[in-house]
């Protein structure tokens, strides 16, 4: 591209900024239980500069960030070949955390937890709370940091140890992305407003709103979840640290087959610190989440062996 010429960025990423501005307006007079921060950061194309500064600012101040939602390129549901998916948004979710030590990564692999990073738990949480008849959207979880060999502003948050994911439209049109505005062989190039689908952007905004509101009003994630690794039994014994919240109603133990993308079962066990489930830890992935008196639930935390 000609870096000396002004170029529009209607989709990349005025669409995401528009979502943030509209949701900030909608929520301005409401009071979530936790703080929701809306931000439009600069310098993404120059090396994720704004996002790096923001993530490090939070980390240096020891801010508890329950989740970061990067909304980037959500302006159109029509791809380069004319394919249309007006009710789908992609959600990119990183696998094993970028901050894990070799020993931590080895333990994760030994228990089959490579698909259960904090980012993927955030992705499952978003899918559960935001893919419904009210948003009229399907959230397509992609098990990858970002599009193939590409990146975005959520990466610095992952590198800082936070759960972070990226929303992106289902099919990109590269005639309208990273292009000088021009007409060539009868084809209009450039990231122009005329190529946006505003109803699609509104549906993506509903997905984001459902996710962030649910996250902000749920009790905090459960920490230090363990499973008894020395007990030879077909039952599974789980332990966890208590969540300090006046909104806490109790905890749910969840599980799914090892090859299932989403949680398939949930068992409310009350306000306790341990639970024994009549299932073998060999055959399923377990997790624990907090449940609020208001009905909101936290993202899941998987157990590691004692």
Curated annotation (Swiss-Prot):
Q: Look up the EC number in the record and give it.
A: 3.4.-.-
Indicate the enzyme's highest-level EC class. Answer: hydrolase
For this UniProt entry, what is the primary localization, expressed as one broad class?
secreted
- Could you say which cofactors this protein requires? Zn(2+)
Which sites bind Zn(2+) 2?
A: 12, 45
* Gene Ontology CC: extracellular region
A biological process (GO) of this protein is: proteolysis
State the SUPFAM superfamilies in the record.
Answer: Fibronectin type III (SSF49265), Zn-dependent exopeptidases (SSF53187)
Q: Does the keyword Protease apply?
A: yes
InterPro entries referenced in this protein's UniProt entry, alphabetically:
FN3_dom (IPR003961), FN3_sf (IPR036116), M28_fam (IPR045175), Peptidase_M28 (IPR007484)
In what residue span(s) does the Fibronectin type-III domain sit?
A: 218-306
State the organism named in the record: Verticillium alfalfae (strain VaMs.102 / ATCC MYA-4576 / FGSC 10136) (Verticillium wilt of alfalfa)
> Which keywords label this protein?
Glycoprotein, Hydrolase, Metal-binding, Metalloprotease, Protease, Secreted, Signal, Zinc
Residues annotated as glycosylated are 60, 228, 234, 244
Q: Which residues bind Zn(2+) 1?
A: 12, 72
Where does this polypeptide localize? Answer: Secreted
Family indicated by similarity: Belongs to the peptidase M28 family. M28B subfamily.
- Keyword Cell inner membrane among record annotations: no
Q: What is the lineage of its organism?
A: Eukaryota, Fungi, Dikarya, Ascomycota, Pezizomycotina
* Cofactor details (free text): Binds 2 Zn(2+) ions per subunit.
The protein's name is: Probable zinc metalloprotease VDBG_06923
Q: Which GO terms describe its molecular function?
A: metal ion binding; metalloexopeptidase activity
N-terminal signal peptide: 1-28
